[in-house]
Amino acid sequence: MRKAKLILDRDYEISPVDKRIYGSFVEHLGRCVYTGIYEPGHPAADENGFRRDVLNLVKELGVPIVRYPGGNYVSGFRWEDAIGPVDQRPKRLDLAWKTTEPNKVGIHEFAAWARKANAEVMYAVNLGTRGPQDAQRIVEYANHKGGSELSDLRIKNGAKDPFGIKLWCLGNEMDGPWQMGSKTAYEYGRIANEAAKMMKWTDPTIEVVACGSSGSGMPTFGEWEYTVLNECYDNVDYVSLHRYYGNPHNDTADFLASTMDLDQFIRTVGSICDAVKGKKRSKKQVNLSLDEWNVWYHSNEEDQKLYKREPWGTALPLLEDVYNFEDALLVGLMLITILKNADRVKVACIAQLVNVIAPIMTRPGGGAWRQTIYWPLMQASLFGRGVSLMPRVECEKADTSHYTDVPMMDAAAVMNDGGEVTLFAVNRDLKEDMELKIDLRAFGTFTKAVHSVLHHDDVKAVNTEACPDQVKPREMNADLRENTVVLPAASWNVIRLLP
């Protein structure tokens, strides 16, 4: 059995945890909206056509904010197409995903659904094929009380009260050649700055997110962030990061080490923000919005076949990754990395919420179930609210195909207002259990410990509609007398220490 030690001190804080790091993402892509959250005629549909069974799973997940409506989709989207009488809305070709969009769900319907889900809306504006004036107009439509043409139009369309959307994305992945209206860093920085100014002049209470690089592998990564922020630093609040990982070569140990890369990515972008801050002699800190993150690779080949079989279809089953147990472990490790960077990462949205690379799956006309990755997301959101503490981990390390000195255990710790401390830990070792000694200096005495474990002997095990509980957390014995717990091989662990 491997040995590890975790040292915590209540005075060694990283930062208060912004609850928005447990956010998600709904894009008009595949079956995320249609036959995902929205399916009129389904036995579980409410009066507005939204599935109650899906809504209940979303509420259980504890998602505080949802990014909408894209994604690549937003760079060709006209928000006016999705307001007014539903039967009069146009169908449009979506060039981003080669499908047909019926516009049955728009800002009115989605805002009403988000309220039921106890979630805020994080709205993305189109800065690809549109510009600053259109971005200002949607803020006026959504957030202005009344008395102007656009706010009165919202009232006419059934929403007397403003939607009160507080967080806005200035486009999506504008460095990507796959993006409609992609731009150079300077071009985008100028447009983002003007859009942010006009949006904030309309509603001074909002915050905005500038597009960072689409990923750290982009040829302009780093240079893009610096150039963009040089143009818009004073008017933006966050810069976005997007990061996905996969295991196409079936190298689980290397796959589980991927968060070494994520941590470096986060720290690098934070440093670039600070470099621009220093250059401008600014007192303002721009923070990070990791508003797309997940495992994504299972469905890639099938998606290409589907495009050939059904060009320009509606609600096609695109990006429907079926997640296995090792994917859940990596999602847990990514959550740990986010918590350890809580001083800079203030927003994070797992992409996406339902069916499309998602923790929740549905069958049209049928059931809804939790994928393996649902569990670490739910537990982190439920127990990871409070102050992120600085963990000192002592454990063995190993090398993988692409990474060196990978700790066999990674962990984060959060203390809530009631003095409860929750540890999130992953044992990366695929074969050996790990005895973890927890050193709680300066904490005093805890009266009770609760240890939840997510483990399966088969790292490729999945949850399905027929077998939805193949991979599910279970409670284990926790004895505080020795301040020691056992982390099973290849496991996600939630250890709650109650005062």
What are these regions (language model features)?
Residues 1-224, 229-238, 262-263, 267-307, ...:
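Non-catalytic accessory regions flanking glycosidase/transglycosidase catalytic cores in CAZymes
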Residues 242-257:
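Active-site His/acidic residue clusters
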